[in-house]
């Protein structure tokens, strides 16, 4: 992994093709929310399939908790769709057969020249693509458990949600004055929030 990809740095805003053939940037997919980014070997790898199956349940929680999940692999668009459908995932999968991310981050898995995948990583991102934590998943047990990711999201949300603890006197006073700027959805309508999630 590139030396500048560390906690506190801003992760590159890659633009890739999603499972539906649409060009997407990571920042657009993230919106104003925390995001878990999975850099995957691809659908051929049983470890990655098992990891994605585990993420299906967490993703249901992330949807109601206003957090995002994205997977990037070096698979082509057909294999990307087979991978996504095969694990019953409902989050965006990005296809990078040109290995833009692999090359830019210097994470070619040189021990597998036949598939030439990325070394698997899971990156927890604060809003603005700010790196909170990086997990190296070359070995399966280097990858975070669902509970570790849940704890990471809790820590990130505590940092980025000004209304994390609405029992504080200052927030109560804001609410009573009609000042809703520090309360979710932070000056937006719910219609705008739901539109951003598409």
State where each predicted segment sits.
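Chalcogenol-based redox active-site neighborhoods
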Residues: 1-198
């Amino acid at each position: 992994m590139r030396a500048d990809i560390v906690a506190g740095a801003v992760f590159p805003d890659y633009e890739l093709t999603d499972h539906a053939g649409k060009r997407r940037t990571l920042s657009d997919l993230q919106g104003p929310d925390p995001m878990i980014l999975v850099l995957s070997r691809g659908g051929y790898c049983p470890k990655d399939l098992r990891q994605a199956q585990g993420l299906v349940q967490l993703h249901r929680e992330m949807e109601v908790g206003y957090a995002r999940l994205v997977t990037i692999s070096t698979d082509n668009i057909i294999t990307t769709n087979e991978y996504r459908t095969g694990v019953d995932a409902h989050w965006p999968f990005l296809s990078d057969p040109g290995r833009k991310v692999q090359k830019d981050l210097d994470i070619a898995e040189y021990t597998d020249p036949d598939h030439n995948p990325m070394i698997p990583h899971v990156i927890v991102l604060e809003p603005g693509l700010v790196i909170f934590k990086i997990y190296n998943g070359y070995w399966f047990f280097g990858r975070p458990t669902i509970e570790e990711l849940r704890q990471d999201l809790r820590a990130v949300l505590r940092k980025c949600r000004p209304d994390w603890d609405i029992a504080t006197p200052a927030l109560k006073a804001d609410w009573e004055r009609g000042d809703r700027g520090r309360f979710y959805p932070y000056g937006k309508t719910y219609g705008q929030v739901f539109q951003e999630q598409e």
